[in-house]
């Protein structure tokens, strides 16, 4: 569950309610997007220990996450404080997480993500994958990595169900029981639909956004919204 939106107590109560509703076989996670202070993360991390599979980026920075890890039993996951090979030394120094949520775009592609898996195995880290909004090419790259990386110990994330359009032939990729089948076709097993690609490229040209700006999307829902840190 994406957190850092409502008061931490309300979000903790929501997680507990979800876990009780889903039952013991469905894992639940929370990601406050580093908006909680260390003190808040400790307080509600202890409350949530019996309910969550892992605790993703509750507070900001490797050193702060390392302090949190000293007092919680729940595994800590990140796709914010360790996102590149240059940040691995700090990750090891502070033991800021137990699970690195790799994004194959940020880490440098599929081969680089495979290398990350080997580093995780050396330093006793688990691996899963982070997803932002993406289309079928990126999704299938993720699926292939999920099959190829033995270090992946948790179901990987995707925002794909939020997307309505697609640029690959055959349209949207279907999930079956929460999983994807990896194609036996060459490469990623998908082909580009040139008509759809041209259409979405035109959307890009017309939208006027050339850099990522999460505030614009949020302001559609809440005018005046600004990115904040340690707001709770």
Residues covered by each model-derived region:
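Structural signal for hydrophobic packing residues in well-ordered secondary-structure cores
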Residues: 19-22, 49-52, 146-150, 201-204
């Amino acid at each position: 569950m994406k957190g850092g939106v409502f008061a931490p107590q309300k979000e903790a109560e929501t997680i507990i309610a979800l876990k009780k509703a889903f039952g013991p076989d469905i894992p639940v996670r929370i990601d406050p997007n580093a908006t909680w202070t260390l003190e808040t993360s400790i307080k509600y991390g202890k409350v949530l220990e019996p309910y969550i599979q892992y605790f993703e980026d509750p507070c900001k920075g490797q050193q702060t996450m390392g302090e949190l890890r000293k007092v919680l039993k729940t595994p800590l996951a990140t796709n914010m404080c360790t996102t590149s090979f240059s940040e691995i030394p700090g990750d090891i120094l502070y033991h800021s997480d137990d699970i690195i949520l790799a994004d194959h775009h940020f880490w440098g592609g599929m081969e680089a993500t495979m290398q990350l898996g080997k580093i995780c195995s050396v330093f006793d880290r688990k691996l899963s994958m982070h997803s932002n909004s993406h289309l079928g090419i990126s999704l299938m790259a993720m699926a292939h990595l999920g099959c190829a990386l033995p270090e992946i110990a948790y179901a990987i994330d995707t925002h794909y169900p939020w997307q309505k359009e697609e640029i690959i032939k055959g349209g949207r990729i279907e999930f079956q029981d929460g999983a994807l089948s990896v194609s036996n076709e060459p490469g990623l097993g998908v082909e580009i639909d040139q008509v759809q690609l041209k259409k979405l490229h035109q959307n890009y040209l017309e939208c006027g956004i050339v850099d990522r700006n999460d505030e614009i999307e949020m302001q559609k829902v809440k005018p005046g919204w600004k990115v904040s840190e340690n707001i709770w």
